[in-house]
């Protein structure tokens, strides 16, 4: 291109480099003429005089603009949310791992990690049973990890944390490893389920989501809610503490509500920066979400003896509300594309509260002259918190030697604050409170502190195949402290009132005045336990690929459990 500097006049040469400038915009005077072409240095001819009516001929020769690059580095971050990337990883993996990415989960309408693993072959979910079965093996034979670190359970009866704790808002992938390897957990017979948290993909991200919905069952029903749980799902855990005072803070009578709307709010965002003279990548990613949903179900409970005799036949109505909040933060730093440092923080709060009313025959409980008929009301809230802090690093020491290390500190608080169970038997005039330990309030709390550390040194071996051969030596440590306390208040009936199921109030009976008058008594029982667990694991593992069809994986591991 040819241009008169300081004007809009210009032209483009033909294939032989010839050009002509004339017409509007070219006036008499002195001009600097600029010549540009791809692959050549820009040439400027100074002080060329242009006169009216005279032809000016210029012969210009451009110099080649040749530059030699020492090297070209293309930096890319793989997107493990994508199904194709996960399939490529599984194809090249030495240990068979099945993984599901968040894009596939979104397409299939899956909302949490429990639903994700149910999509994997050999994994099943049984209604009414917590967590999943892998090849028929339940909770005891499986293990759960988060970004490769073990994570404790929020329930003292279970080894693994409930997978529905983890919504797809914070999941990048869910992997299921059914094969044993030296670097993994030794306490696994079914599978290790690893949940990988989200991280920033690309240069930047920002998203706000709001959704709502309703369940037709909850819209047309007077929805019952238990007392003692606020709008954020935080339960009141206050106990009376003394047997001679009835000062429970929460009511025994649930409240009625209508027009229950499911709602979900979420925001996520992140940004990638390049810092320092080497333009090292520094990124952060944040997620926060709140969810509230309602469910209503009508149930039939029927139990029989071995010879087919029915001893329990009840119908029930269950009102359930689930409230959860989550927050995720990820900070990631790459130094010269060889050293990697990352920090992950996650907070999950999950509250499930339910009111269940069951009416009918139960000869094991209501054993009397009125056809063993009775009524049971069960009010329960499970209020759980999970805090996770993880620091991980990976260093490329040489072209063949790398070092990785990490630490994770988890805090779990699982509580069942003020579970209320009341049983009423059918009588001639209506219903009366059942004697014995049938009227109960129960408080429990589990506090678990879990520290995990790991380190490994990997030496890459040369082979003629895909260069996956290596020798690895490593250490894993886990140090757990559990404290559990359960307090049970049995409110034994001495003189019962008569109730009608249509409009009965238990608060009218259970109060300080009736306790003082001897209508009922309170017995308080406390159970506690403390567990300390230290696990040290050291291992050596070797992988060598002989050809495209043969790979050797050999490992030795030592575990010490105190």
Report residues per predicted region.
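Transmembrane beta-barrel wall of Gram-negative outer-membrane proteins
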Residues: 250-357, 387
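Flexible, solvent-exposed coil segments and beta strand-coil junctions
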Residues: 154-155, 171-173, 241-250, 303-313, ...
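Outer-membrane beta-barrel proteins
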Residues: 106, 164, 176-190, 245-263, ...
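Face-selective signature of the C-terminal outer-membrane beta-barrel domain
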Residues: 334-348, 380-562
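Flexible, surface-exposed loop regions and adjacent strand-edge segments
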Residues: 50, 89-91, 224-229, 298-309, ...
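N-terminal secretion/transport leader regions
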Residues: 1-5, 33-38, 59-61, 69-80, ...
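Periplasmic N-terminal accessory/gating domains of Gram-negative outer-membrane beta-barrel systems
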Residues: 18-19, 41, 47-49, 79-80, ...
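Periplasm-facing N-terminal accessory domains of Gram-negative outer-membrane beta-barrel systems
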Residues: 1-71
